[in-house]
């Protein structure tokens, strides 16, 4: 039970460390369609981040119970699932 208290913070540090390497960009310049479980405010990197996001070309987020979003990147880099960076919810 005690190991669970330390697992989440160490995972979060790994994600934030990866996100910190993103260069500053315009908000809508590199926006791509993604599906996320939730979009939440973030202190660093500034803006909003998406939780449990994946690239979505079919735009069927509602079918899986996720939120249709637009994010600049997903970290860690090179994967299809992860934390969305600089996200916004699509209407």
From Swiss-Prot:
Disulfide bridge positions per record: 31-70, 35-61, 36-53, 71-87
Alphabetical UniProt keywords: Cell wall, Disulfide bond, Secreted, Signal
The keyword Disulfide bond is annotated on this UniProt entry: yes
Tissues expressing the protein: Expressed in conidia.
Key word Transit peptide present: no
Subcellular location(s) of the protein: Secreted; Secreted, Cell wall
Signal sequence extent: 1-17
Function, in words: Aerial growth, conidiation, and dispersal of filamentous fungi in the environment rely upon a capability of their secreting small amphipathic proteins called hydrophobins (HPBs) with low sequence identity. Class I can self-assemble into an outermost layer of rodlet bundles on aerial cell surfaces, conferring cellular hydrophobicity that supports fungal growth, development and dispersal; whereas Class II form highly ordered films at water-air interfaces through intermolecular interactions but contribute nothing to the rodlet structure.
Subunit structure: Self-assembles to form functional amyloid fibrils called rodlets. Self-assembly into fibrillar rodlets occurs spontaneously at hydrophobic:hydrophilic interfaces and the rodlets further associate laterally to form amphipathic monolayers.
Homology family: Belongs to the fungal hydrophobin family.
Protein name (database record): Class I hydrophobin 3
Organism: Metarhizium acridum (strain CQMa 102)
